[in-house]
């Protein structure tokens, strides 16, 4: 079973939906949508659009975490992260 990861950033949601669909139709059985910080809402939108377009797509796992990121002047801050695993039967 192959698994591909799609990292969500600042591009439009449709670009990420297309990337996920391409990997699913090119032989991958699983897609992991990953995002941090403000991109989390864009990741959730991507997954919902995928679930609407592919009725047989299954939500396998959702993992939430907090990552420590180094900022300017040596400060550290916590950033939320999400990983959503989708699979097709």
Regions found by a protein language model. Name each.
Residues 38-55:
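Conserved helicase motor "Helicase C" RecA-like lobe of SF1/SF2 P-loop NTPases
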Residues 3-29:
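An N-terminal amphipathic alpha-helical segment
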Residues 11, 36, 87:
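Structured beta-strand/turn binding interfaces of compact recognition modules in eukaryotic regulators
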Residues 25-41:
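Short glycine-rich, basic-tinged beta-strand/loop micro-motifs
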